[in-house]
Amino acid sequence: MRLILLGAPGAGKGTQANFIKEKFGIPQISTGDMLRAAVKAGTPLGVEAKTYMDEGKLVPDSLIIGLVKERLKEADCANGYLFDGFPRTIAQADAMKEAGVAIDYVLEIDVPFSEIIERMSGRRTHPASGRTYHVKFNPPKVEGKDDVTGEPLVQRDDDKEETVKKRLDVYEAQTKPLITYYGDWARRGAENGLKAPAYRKISGLGAVEEIRARVFDALK
């Protein structure tokens, strides 16, 4: 099972990624984790990546793809792998295709932006413990107060509506075009000797268990 998980920030990809990893016994491939590990290990690609990171520059896609290919050779990828958060752009998707990275499924978890804004902007956190609440879906017993300590809850900057909207704008511009990219490739079929991935789209609305059932149905 080799798949890419697509969906906007706040669509619930992380939760479903954990279910997929557990069911199929595959690792989640995080480019951030790979970069940090390569830099720490001092591999040639890691050393090269560090020069960009130290200057505050984006690591080039060619370097990221090199790290991905190295990572996929490791033993835990024998049964497959899960990409969440990569590729983010058409250029990265093209680079993966040119590098011959095989993908069986591209799964999109679709949630309307209005729902994502409500989900994320309604979160409230107790900073000391990390306990989280939601003003609508999981409210504290006393408004604005932690259930255990009675201390004030805060809204993290990441959860503020304007921040969420900005992240969704970036997704709309950079990552949403991948939905068309992979849908078109699935219709065209194999290219350059690389099998086209099957494209699946499910609704990310409803209970976590309902969404999990949809995910597993889509991956049959």
Swiss-Prot record:
InterPro entries: Adenyl_kin_sub, Adenylat/UMP-CMP_kin, Adenylat_kinase_CS, Adenylate_kinase_lid-dom, P-loop_NTPase. Residues 30-59 are annotated as: NMP. Signal peptide: none annotated. It is found in: Cytoplasm. PROSITE patterns: ADENYLATE_KINASE. One of its GO terms (biological process) is AMP salvage. Keywords: ATP-binding, Cytoplasm, Kinase, Nucleotide biosynthesis, Nucleotide-binding, Transferase. It is an enzyme of class 2 (transferase). Residues 122-159 are annotated as: LID. It holds the Pfam family ADK. AMP binds at T31, R36, K57, L58, V59, G85, F86, P87, R88, Q92, R156, R167. ATP binds at G10, A11, G12, K13, G14, T15, R123, T132, Y133, G206. Pathway: Purine metabolism; AMP biosynthesis via salvage pathway; AMP from ADP: step 1/1. It catalyses: AMP + ATP = 2 ADP. It comes from the Bacteria. GO terms for molecular function: adenylate kinase activity; ATP binding. One of its GO terms (cellular component) is cytoplasm. Its EC number is 2.7.4.3. Catalyzes the reversible transfer of the terminal phosphate group between ATP and AMP. Plays an important role in cellular energy homeostasis and in adenine nucleotide metabolism. Monomer. Belongs to the adenylate kinase family. Consists of three domains, a large central CORE domain and two small peripheral domains, NMPbind and LID, which undergo movements during catalysis. The LID domain closes over the site of phosphoryl transfer upon ATP binding. Assembling and dissambling the active center during each catalytic cycle provides an effective means to prevent ATP hydrolysis. This is Adenylate kinase. It comes from Burkholderia pseudomallei (strain 1710b). The lineage of its organism: Bacteria, Pseudomonadati, Pseudomonadota, Betaproteobacteria, Burkholderiales.
